[in-house]
Amino acid sequence: MRRTGKQTVSCILGGVVLAPLVGIAAPTDSSDELDSIIVVGQKENQGIQRAPEAITALPTEVLKQNVVRSAEDLDGLVPSLVIGESDGYNFDLSIRGIGLNSPQDDGSPASVSVHQNGIFMPNPLALSLSFLDVDHIEVLRGPQGTVFGQNAVGGTLNIITVQPTFDAVKGYSDVELGSFDLTHLRTAVNLPLSSTFAIRLAGDFIKQDGYVSATQVPGDYHLNDTHNYHVRMTALFQPIENFSVVGSLEYAKVVQHEPESKNILDPNTNPYDETSDWPGVYDIDQTIATLTATYDFSAMTFKSLSSVQYMNQGGSNSESGLTVPIATNLYGGENDQFVLHQNYAVTQEFDLSSKPGGPTC
């Protein structure tokens, strides 16, 4: 994980002060009162102190303070959660030592499930995307199979995004600048179009030059750079008080040259130079469409969660990190890895949960 110097500039859109985020209570006069964090670990909103499970919730303030941009930045931030890196672009979750058995199999389901707003994300490559307009993140220690399905033996990571509201036009923009020409722009705006319909637009754009040169590739070729963007539109329709529909459409693109892997037999001793002649690159595209319908009965809540997800990944890298002549002399040949992976998934889930004091099974 790369650490870079940075400066951040923020502004609020719409000329209004943002209200406290969902799940974070406004400051009170009593120093003995704890802030309230609302979690959905059991598929229903409840205070984290009342949730009967091992759960860690990270509100947006904590994510900003620790510069959490993506899943890899959670490593070391949550007890018992470990983020492993495979080939520089794929990140594997494990909780309490239980996780992905084969990190090289990018399409295999892990033992720690990933969800966004309660919707299952079947492809572990989704972890390579940036966290976009996040309200809070919940980490539930396993087993969680009863609530989240067979892929949650180790636990579950649930990313809760900021939802549209009807109260006001509001938003934010952050610009982060850093070393290696880092430019990171995050922005979001909430637009209430009527008393029953509102949308929220969000975007995350990041560019940073690589810090290692592949000296034998023609031109100024740097490894481990970043050229990513991630956009989302979320719409809320609530014609009556006890019924709502939330739909979202998002697209993300991750482009980077192959990760730096300095071979101990590299004749160039400069750690910022790699004697490689292979112009490796990784390119990931993901499109996600979701629809969540919620109806509140007097004693129970019914929810339908639907999604269509498509991901395409392509790329290649040099296993040796050397030129072909050097690799041939040392190993008898070069080993270049090529990746082409496509994943298409349709998910559908129905939840029926009782309210406090309501009927139970």
Region locations from a protein language model:
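N-terminal Sec signal peptide and the immediately downstream disordered periplasmic leader
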Residues: M1-N66, E72-S80, N190, E241, ...
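Acidic, small-polar-rich N-terminal luminal/periplasmic segments of exported/outer-membrane proteins
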Residues: D32-F166
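Structural signature of outer-membrane beta-barrel domains
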Residues: E44, Y89, G178-F180, I206-G210, ...
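Transmembrane beta-barrel architecture of outer-membrane proteins
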Residues: N66, N90, S111, G154, ...
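Transmembrane beta-barrel wall of Gram-negative outer-membrane proteins
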Residues: K170-Y172, L177-Q208, V212-H257, T287, ...
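Flexible, surface-exposed loop regions and adjacent strand-edge segments
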Residues: V217-H222, A252, S261-P271, Q309, ...
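Flexible loop and strand-edge segments within Gram-negative outer membrane beta-barrel domains
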Residues: S244, S248-Q286, Q337-H341
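Face-selective signature of the C-terminal outer-membrane beta-barrel domain
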Residues: G247-E250, I284-G315, D336-C361
